[in-house]
Amino acid sequence: MERSASVGVNDGRFGGNQFYSPSFSSSSSSSSMRHVNYSCGSCGYELNLSSTNRITSTIGSKYGKSMKSGIISFFNIDEGRFSQVDEFQCMPHFSRYSWGLFRHRTKLLCRKCNNYIGNASQEKAPEYALVTQNSDPTSPRIGSVTKYDIRIRSLQPSSAVALL
């Protein structure tokens, strides 16, 4: 399936660029799907962060807001690659789903250069239980899930691997 579009000189959407001609093809889009491994943006230390472990449920309506704030979230990291510093704050905090006077979070630092990478925080488990082939749906759910919020500017891509 091949689709192409051309925009004329007088079309104001692209500033009169007569050479704008995006092409979309199903064969090129499948070969361009890659996952990226990230390393520390300061020293280049491999953090074993992979884009396959990103929380992609926020991609959609909240994706633009997440990118503007410079944060990407992961559900799994290699904790051996980070130094972790527990932080307790005694000040009012408000977010969309919680508020309080005390906040506990864990700062994630690069193990090699101690550059601030992001935060780990506990979140409530979803109201529904995910059932997989090997899981028992009658077993009790875990009360909270750890979410890792990583600053984009603290990372650099170390490699990109094509998915087939």
From Swiss-Prot:
A GO CC annotation given for this chain: chloroplast
Transit peptide: which residues? Answer: 1-60
Q: Plastid among the record's keywords?
A: yes
Extract the Pfam families matched here.
At4g08330
Where in the cell does this protein reside? Plastid, Chloroplast
The source's superkingdom equals Eukaryota
Keywords of this protein's UniProt record, alphabetized? Chloroplast, Plastid, Transit peptide
Return the InterPro entries for the record.
At4g08330-like (IPR045282)
Q: What is this protein called?
A: Uncharacterized protein At4g08330, chloroplastic
* Organism listed in the record: Arabidopsis thaliana (Mouse-ear cress)
